[in-house]
Regions:
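N-terminal cap/lid segment of alpha/beta-hydrolase-fold proteins
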Residues: 1-20, 51
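C-terminal catalytic histidine-bearing segment of alpha/beta-hydrolase fold enzymes
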Residues: 13, 200-239
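Short beta-strand element of the alpha/beta-hydrolase
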Residues: 21-30
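Short amphipathic alpha-helix adjacent to the substrate-entry channel of hydrolases
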Residues: 39-57
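Alpha/beta-hydrolase active-site loop
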Residues: 72-123, 232-233
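Primarily recognizes the serine-hydrolase "nucleophile elbow" in alpha/beta-hydrolase
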Residues: 102-175
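Short beta-strand/loop motif that positions the catalytic acidic residue
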Residues: 179-182
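Acidic catalytic loop of the alpha/beta-hydrolase fold
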Residues: 184-190
């Protein structure tokens, strides 16, 4: 886990040159923009991609500051990060309230810088710039989507927002193909499929996997939710 990141880094995990297929992925771990799940949603994902011939680049982007003490941080997060109380459920037929928009200017700048580095060093790393995409997990999924919708410098070939926000968005005409994964028992899932419908209605390619079990934060999959373990193969096969 990483916290209080004030300087972004980009770490490449490259495939065996004999197995490389030219595709590249920026991997953005999640953690509510307060910490980063570097192992479960960063290094493990990057290694799985590299094992399948895809150059992976783990982006450790800037975060909101948190308490210096790990104990204090855990206590704060336990109070503010959990399943919504039943009283917060909207009336039948009404969509849940959308969360307030966060300022992601720093994180977007970090993603744009990572993309620029990939373009600059593509030949060195054996990367096909026309096959460079981005995947992210929860907050990283939000950053992936934010980059897709708002960046003026990134031209992503594909995106994979994994168990991220599902609300509807305004899809650009040139939006990249999207691969989306979610578990139905994710405590943050509110029964919305807006982003999927938005992509579909815009006529842009989209593939969506809804697993019955897996909860939130399953990364590459849990042993007790074997279906989720297929997500890396599904994603790499899709790219």
């Amino acid at each position: 886990m990483a916290r209080n990141v004030s300087t972004a880094t980009l770490t490449p995990l490259l495939p065996d040159p004999a197995e490389a297929n030219g595709a590249a992925v920026i991997v953005a771990p999640g953690g509510a923009f307060r910490w980063l799940s570097m192992n479960n949603e960063g290094w493990k994902v990057a290694r799985a991609l590299a094992d399948r011939g895809i150059a992976a680049f783990v982006l450790k982007y800037r975060l909101q500051p948190t308490e210096p003490s790990l104990d204090d941080f855990r206590e704060r997060m336990s109070q503010g990060f959990g399943p919504p109380p039943s009283s917060s459920e909207p009336p039948a037929g009404e969509a849940p309230p959308r969360p307030g928009r966060s300022d992601l200017s720093n994180q977007l700048a970090d993603a744009e810088a990572a993309y620029a580095i990939l373009l600059e060093r593509a030949s060195e790393w054996g990367v096909d710039t026309d096959r460079t995409g981005m995947i992210g997990f929860p907050a990283g999924a939000g950053l992936t989507m934010h980059s897709t919708l708002h960046s003026k410098t990134m031209t992503l070939a594909f995106i994979g927002p994994i168990y991220g926000g599902m609300g509807p968005v305004e899809v650009p005409e040139d939006a990249p193909p999207m691969f989306n994964v979610l578990a139905s028992d994710d405590f943050l899932f509110r029964g919305q499929f807006g982003v999927i419908k938005s992509w579909f209605d815009a006529g842009r390619p989209v593939e969506f996997h809804l697993y019955q079990n897996g909860g939130h934060g399953f990364g590459l999959g849990y042993p007790d939710a074997p279906a989720t373990a297929g997500s890396p193969s599904s994603c790499t096969g899709w790219t």
